[in-house]
Regions:
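N-terminal Rossmann-like NAD(P)+-binding domain of SDR-like oxidoreductases, especially those catalyzing
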Residues: 1-184, 309, 317, 323-330
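Active-site loop immediately N-terminal to the catalytic Tyr-X3-Lys motif
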Residues: 97, 179, 191-192, 237
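The catalytic Tyr-centered alpha-helix of NAD(P)H-dependent dehydrogenases
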Residues: 150-157, 187, 191-195, 219-223
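Residues in well-ordered alpha-helical elements
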Residues: 69-72, 91, 98, 109, ...
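C-terminal substrate-binding subdomain of Rossmann-fold SDR/epimerase-dehydratase oxidoreductases
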Residues: 7, 19-22, 31, 63, ...
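Hydrophobic alpha-helix immediately C-terminal to the catalytic Tyr-X-X-X-Lys motif of short-chain
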Residues: 160, 164, 168, 198, ...
Length: 330
């Protein structure tokens, strides 16, 4: 049997690199080769791929998903695309949204076009979207059929790319599968996001900035469980379908902060309440019945254990995050 040649965009980032390390690691499918296409923005980190760099099944192409000619050339040699590349930080999209629209919308459309028009035939396209496309929900959980009501420029750019991806299925018959996951956590997470920011601040004895009263609720998904869900959809999902992927642990930011204070042996003295994020969604909650029933998805990582492991990883890998924090002035 020949290997499936998978093109992973954004594979030098947090989730994409974990996906690549897993695919090429001992628990991977074994019958794949992986090419990462990544622009190496501030969030892309070559060190995230150190574990696989010498693997003969791995290759890396530096470049922008908006570069039509490059994308067509790279896509030509692949059988599947798994698309993570994006501008991903909500706060940055509030400061300036242009890059979000360019990369997340135009970049996705460039890839879809290359997937559709590939010499030798179209290739399946797994689009990694987010639960933020649904907006905010006070009670209950969103099934995949709920309308999209994104609030931040980031979420709106992801909703746009999500819909453009599905349009390539409905219009052209391209095999497009969309996943909408909740908030990921784990190692190698860029230290501007809440969990790694709080852990690294606490490790340094600094205060952590909690938005407003910390009442915003998020569902937390460990990266191992996210990869499990993505692989189920890549290998067994149906073309044209959307699959929610959640972790099953809903916490307010205040509850999350409490757990991180405990892990670091700190108190609420270390917390600074800061002005709330503009347009801050109150609660996200995805209904994962579809992926559970159709593909047998089961999140396995206990949140308390996963958070402790994540805390320990940052404690033990200062050399990974310290330069990133200094460079980004976090
Ligand atoms: P990240 O910011 O850590 O990584 C993004 C990667 O994309 C980086 O390696 C960056 O260099 C690359 N990139 C950015 N612009 C590019 C371009 N124009 N061309 C090529 N590469 C480019 O993001 P992440 O947290 O790993 O998220 C991955 C995907 O998952 C994103 O699509 C994001 O919207 C989605 N997602 C993330 C979360 C989460 O909790 N982190 C939750 C839901 C959905």
């Amino acid at each position: 049997m020949t290997d499936t040649r998978i093109l992973v965009t954004g594979g030098a980032g947090f989730i994409g690199s974990h996906y690549v390390r897993t695919l090429l690691g001992p628990d991977g499918p074994g019958d794949v080769t992986v090419t990462v296409l990544d622009k190496l923005t501030y969030a892309g980190n070559p060190a995230n791929l150190d574990d696989v760099r010498s693997n003969p099944r791995f290759s890396f192409v530096p470049g922008d998903i908006c570069d039509r000619e490059l994308v067509a050339r790279v896509v030509a040699g692949h059988d599947q695309i798994v698309h993570f590349a994006a501008e991903s930080h909500v706060d940055r999209s509030i400061q300036g949204a242009a890059e979000f629209i360019t990369t997340n919308v135009l970049g996705t459309q460039t890839l879809l076009d290359a997937a559709l028009r590939r010499p030798g035939g179209p290739v399946p396209f797994l689009h990694v979207s987010t639960d933020e496309v649904y907006g905010s929900i006070d009670e209950g959980s969103w099934p995949e059929t709920d309308p999209l009501r994104p609030n931040s420029p980031y979420a709106a750019s992801k909703a746009s790319s999500d819909l453009v991806a599905l349009s390539y299925h409905r219009t052209h018959g391209l095999d497009v599968r969309v996943t909408r996951c909740s908030n990921n956590y784990g190692h190698h997470h860029f230290p501007e996001k809440v969990i790694p920011l709080f852990i690294t601040n606490l490790l340094d004895g600094h205060k952590v900035p909690l938005y407003g009263e910390g009442l915003n609720v998020r569902d937390w998904l460990h990266i191992d469980d996210h990869v499990q869900g993505l692989e189920l959809v890549r290998t067994g999902g149906r073309p044209g379908e959307v699959y929610n992927i959640g972790g099953g642990t809903e916490l307010s930011n205040k509850e999350l902060t409490e757990l991180l204070l405990e892990l670091s042996g700190s108190t609420w003295q270390s917390v600074e309440h800061v002005a709330d994020r503009l347009g801050h969604d109150l609660r996200y909650s995805v209904d994962c019945t579809k992926i559970r029933e159709e593909l047998g998805y089961r999140p396995r990582k206990d949140f308390t254990q996963g958070l402790r492991e994540t805390f320990d990883w940052y404690r033990d890998n200062r050399a990974w995050w310290e330069p990133l924090k200094n460079r980004a002035a976090l």
